[in-house]
Swiss-Prot record:
Binding of heme b b562, residues: 83, 182
Other notes: Heme 1 (or BL or b562) is low-potential and absorbs at about 562 nm, and heme 2 (or BH or b566) is high-potential and absorbs at about 566 nm.
One GO BP: mitochondrial electron transport, ubiquinol to cytochrome c
A Pfam family matched in the record: Cytochrome_B
Family classification: Belongs to the cytochrome b family.
InterPro entries to which the protein is assigned, alphabetical: Cyt_b/b6_C (IPR005798), Cyt_b/b6_C_sf (IPR036150), Cyt_b/b6_N (IPR005797), Cytb/b6-like_sf (IPR027387), Cytochrome_b (IPR030689), Cytochrome_b_C_euk/bac (IPR048260), Cytochrome_b_N_euk/bac (IPR048259), Di-haem_cyt_TM (IPR016174)
Protein known as: Cytochrome b
Gene name per UniProt: MT-CYB
Highest taxon listed in the record's lineage: Eukaryota
GO cellular component: mitochondrial inner membrane; respiratory chain complex III
Predominant cellular place of this UniProt entry's protein: mitochondrion
Record function comment: Component of the ubiquinol-cytochrome c reductase complex (complex III or cytochrome b-c1 complex) that is part of the mitochondrial respiratory chain. The b-c1 complex mediates electron transfer from ubiquinol to cytochrome c. Contributes to the generation of a proton gradient across the mitochondrial membrane that is then used for ATP synthesis.
Transmembrane segment boundaries: 33-53, 77-98, 113-133, 178-198, 226-246, 288-308, 320-340, 347-367
Length: 379
């Protein structure tokens, strides 16, 4: 008799995705981040659900309801900080997952990669609308500044911004709709993640060498299930350490002041995971130009498969490309630092140089390195 997991319509899907899935025998811990992202998503949906039971999306009570969650609800402070720091862990895993894809050439699975870019945009949108909900100073002014960027669109910009606001400024209508978006988007992310996985399983996983591994596959269970459980435990350990020891380490103190439309904070800045894009936005002295650069800094990922010039898929055996990859990482860390600094000398010029280098590396230097390495193969 055949095992039920191989015949039952639902069990068969799970079996083919997590149990009998043929997996390359040599994938490293950099391949753990996909499952960690799934774990993050589940944790965020669960903690978010419990927060939504006590939160009120109204300008007069939103800030107080968050304070009420932290003070009066049983373990409310814990759920709230798990959710806030869970977002940071989500983005750490997301950036590591993308870095892995860039380094090992996983972007050559084009459908999987493009859905991944779409997932990134959706997660960024979710994090942005979520940051507005506590209705602190940085929530309010962050929402005002970022939504205002749409006014740079010629002709329809102002109308578009007022349509998103539901009025002439960020107000009650804005908060209510942002709560609605923040509630629905994670479920859209879940659906997209399922499609992401569907397309990945059409091709199978890539591996560090970038060479097809069809002749050397092992079953996903037990080898990678146990490896993913270890990764998950380390993720939960890190999240708990962050939440229980320094819950406000990554937050902004300004968000403990209730939103006040009449008082602008001295330094408006987003959460750390958006600072690199914010630095690129600020480094262009023209509003529309800045908005376009901001969009392009993320959308450039779509073009990466087309910019592949090397005959080798992975960077494992490509020293020049490796060097440029780590320069790109250093550049992104520099942009993250600059995004959190005030707009003054020398930060302005450093930000502008880092922004130019970011686009130069992806569009010019890395494809050129690929061509040079192709020549070196013939020596």
């Amino acid at each position: 008799m055949t095992n039920i997991r191989k015949t039952h319509p639902l069990m068969k899907i799970l079996n083919d995705a997590f149990i009998d899935l043929p997996t390359p025998s040599n994938i490293s811990s950099w391949w753990n981040f996909g499952s960690l992202l799934g774990l993050c998503l589940i944790m965020q949906i669960l903690t978010g659900l419990f927060l939504a039971m006590h939160y009120t999306p109204d300008t007069t009570t939103a800030f107080s309801s968050v304070a009420h969650i932290c003070r009066d609800v049983n373990y409310g402070w814990f759920i709230r900080y798990l959710h806030a720091n869970g977002a940071s862990m989500f983005f750490i895993c997301l950036y590591a997952h993308m870095g892995r894809g860039l380094y090992y050439g996983s972007y050559m699975f084009q459908e999987t990669w493009n859905i991944g870019v779409l997932l990134l945009l959706t997660v960024m949108a979710t994090a942005f609308v979520g940051y507005v909900l506590p209705w602190g100073q940085m929530s309010f002014w962050g929402a005002t500044v970022i939504t205002n960027l749409l006014s740079a669109i010629p002709y329809i910009g102002t109308t578009l911004v007022e349509w998103i606001w539901g009025g002439f400024s960020v107000d009650k209508a804005t908060l209510t709709r942002f709560f609605a978006f923040h509630f629905i988007l994670p479920f859209i992310i879940t659906a997209l993640a399922a499609v992401h996985l569907l397309f990945l399983h059409e091709t199978g996983s890539n591996n560090p060498t970038g060479i097809p591994s069809n002749m050397d596959m092992i079953p996903f269970h037990p080898y990678y299930t146990i490896k993913d459980i270890l990764g998950g435990l380390l993720l939960i350990l890190t999240l708990l350490a962050l939440t229980l020891f320094t819950p406000d380490l990554l937050g902004d103190p300004d968000n403990y002041t209730p939103a006040n439309p009449l008082s602008t904070p001295p330094h408006i800045k987003p959460e750390w995971y958006f600072l690199f894009a914010y630095a690129i936005l600020r480094s262009i002295p023209n509003k529309l130009g800045g908005v376009l650069a901001l969009l392009l800094s993320i959308l450039i990922l779509i073009f990466i498969p087309m910019l592949q010039t090397s005959k080798q898929r992975s960077m494992m055996f490509r020293p020049f490309s490796q060097l440029l990859f780590w320069v790109l990482i250093a550049d992104l860390l520099t942009l993250t630092w600059i995004g959190g600094q005030p707009v003054e000398h020398p930060y302005i010029i450093v930000g502008q140089l880092a922004s130019i280098l970011y686009f130069l590396l992806i569009l010019v230097l890395m494809p050129t390195a690929g061509l040079i390495e192709n020549k070196l193969l013939k020596w």
